[in-house]
Amino acid sequence: MHGFTRIATAAVLMLASASALAGRIEEIKARGYVRIGVSLGGEPVGFRNSANEPVGYDVDVAKQLAARLGVPVRFSDVSSDARISMLRSKQLDLVVANVSITPQRARVVDFSMPYNVAGLRVIAQKSAHVKTLADLNGKRVVVGRGTTADAFLRQSAPGATPVYTDNFAPDGVLLLQQKRADAGIEDASLLDYLASRNAQFETLPTMYGNTPIGIAMAKGDPALLQFVNAFVADYVKSGAYAANYRKWWGAKALPPALQAK
């Protein structure tokens, strides 16, 4: 009898859990909008236009995801420090903010399959004649303080002089535009965009690293994760990914290869 009671109790708990999980998407629909965190600190991934509206690659992805959900989106501009905690505290439903999928982050939030990839690239003044990593030695190179770019520079060109900034965009960009630095190392997507709009710069063709970027959400919601993964798979296979990438990085840009599972 006790065994039957335990089984019945477990079944009730499983049904209740399944109902709660299925209700997460329904909660968004009942609310009438989806809350999505984006990072508006760097073109072309996310920034504000002249009308102070959120625009950019990630913003377009978020809008398409909201359309798939059938509700409008309400954006929050999130910092790298706050985005995970805002998901876990349920202040946000999703984060589409150029978030790298790492084992450490995957322990506390769930990630969709990749909808973009990131890697480091080198940008330089054309007058600096930087063609290889070795050419950075003896040059002033702007990097974010304590970032992977900082560590990469110290390893790849120990003779370079780091010029530190806490925010590559806009502070590091300004240093380059004012020629207070010869070169810079940052996320390839940002630097490709910067070089396409500033004739004084050129980028090295190699992208160093290949880090997947995913849509993040609070753990414990397999229904929402499945929904978002289906969206990303269609986003890649339908050609929307390539079109969106070229919209923001230029018609001649080559979107990094993604696998739609």
What feature does the model see in each segment?
Residues 75-85, 163-178, 211:
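Short helix-initiation/N-cap motifs at beta->coil->alpha
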Residues 59-68, 134, 139-140, 147-148, ...:
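Extended ligand-binding regions for polar small-molecule ligands
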Residues 63, 67, 72-135, 202-207:
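Acidic, polar ligand-binding/catalytic clefts
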Residues 116-124, 170-171, 188, 192-233, ...:
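Periplasmic-binding protein-like
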Residues 35-44, 54-67, 100, 121-171, ...:
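Bilobed "Venus flytrap"/periplasmic-binding protein-like clamshell domains
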Residues 148-167, 199-204, 233-261:
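Ligand-binding clefts/hinges and TM-proximal coupling segments of bilobed small-molecule sensing domains
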Residues 82-85, 99-107, 152-155, 177-209:
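A ligand-binding cleft/hinge motif common to bilobed small-molecule-binding domains
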Residues 22-98:
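Extracytoplasmic small-molecule ligand-binding "clamshell" domains
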